[in-house]
């Protein structure tokens, strides 16, 4: 069970008000809604469920798990040993390379950079944990989240559920503004996704390094289409 302090820090880390810019991104939803592929709460829910089960969020969360595990065993006052430095750098570069569109890559790196800067402002001693990713190298959001959660003593299970829930919450928020839908419809959808989030989290924990893949061609096409969309409210 999380301590009271860790619980509060988890709530802070997954809060929609965390200044990392998540509200600026729809991950292709804006393009899909303009094309008429998503028109109501049911089609929005179907899209988010599909992404939860087969999309790139599965890979993102799996990389967050690896960052958390690598950092979670280290005392806060110690510099990470060279194997850990190497692995963190590898997974950060690997995740950047797997992005299927410019907007999705920029989203992950912008949010990751903002979270890294925020964590350094809040907890200067976390600097050593980010040592494998120098300030000149962009940091993916999944890496920064995993390191921050581990540093704050948030256990892996709660970190993973929080990561997935905040992702779903952000997409629902974007959908509410774009379709548009009422707030109650959004809350019903978020509640409906609870079993899927719980199930997918357990599946993610079972993924080995060779199992990391996603079938997200729909997301890739939507994101690429959004890059040339004439009128846009969101950055992805």
Curated annotation (Swiss-Prot):
Compartments (UniProt record): Cytoplasm
InterPro entries: UreF (IPR002639), UreF_sf (IPR038277)
This protein's UniProt keywords: Chaperone, Cytoplasm, Nickel insertion
Domain of life: Bacteria
Molecular function in Gene Ontology: nickel cation binding
GO cellular component: cytoplasm
Pfam families in UniProt: UreF (PF01730)
Function per UniProt: Required for maturation of urease via the functional incorporation of the urease nickel metallocenter.
Subunit description: UreD, UreF and UreG form a complex that acts as a GTP-hydrolysis-dependent molecular chaperone, activating the urease apoprotein by helping to assemble the nickel containing metallocenter of UreC. The UreE protein probably delivers the nickel.
UniProt family annotation: Belongs to the UreF family.
PANTHER family: UREASE ACCESSORY PROTEIN F
HAMAP family membership: UreF
Protein name (database record): Urease accessory protein UreF
Source taxonomy: Bacteria, Bacillati, Cyanobacteriota, Cyanophyceae, Synechococcales
Gene name as annotated: ureF
């Amino acid at each position: 069970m999380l301590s009271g302090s860790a619980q509060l820090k988890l709530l802070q880390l997954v809060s929609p008000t965390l200044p990392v810019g998540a509200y600026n991104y729809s991950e292709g939803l804006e393009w899909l809604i303009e094309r008429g592929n998503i028109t109501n709460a049911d089609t929005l829910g179907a899209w988010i469920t599909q992404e939860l089960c087969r999309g790139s969020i599965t890979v993102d969360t799996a990389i967050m798990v690896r960052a958390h595990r690598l950092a979670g065993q280290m005392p806060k006052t110690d510099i990470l040993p060279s194997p850990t430095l190497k692995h963190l750098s590898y997974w950060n570069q690997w995740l950047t390379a797997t992005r299927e569109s410019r907007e999705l890559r920029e989203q992950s790196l912008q949010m990751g950079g903002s979270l890294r800067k925020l964590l350094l402002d809040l907890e200067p001693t976390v600097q050593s944990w980010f040592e494998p990713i120098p300030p000149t190298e962009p940091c993916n959001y999944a890496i920064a989240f995993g390191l921050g959660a581990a540093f704050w003593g948030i256990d892996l299970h709660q970190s993973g559920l929080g990561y997935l829930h905040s992702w779903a919450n952000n997409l629902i928020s974007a959908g509410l503004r774009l379709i548009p839908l009422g707030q109650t419809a959004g809350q019903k959808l978020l509640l409906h996704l609870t079993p899927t989030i719980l199930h997918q989290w357990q599946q993610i924990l079972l993924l080995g390094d060779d199992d990391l893949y996603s079938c997200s061609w729909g997301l890739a096409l939507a994101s690429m289409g959004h890059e040339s969309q004439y009128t846009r409210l969101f950055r992805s």
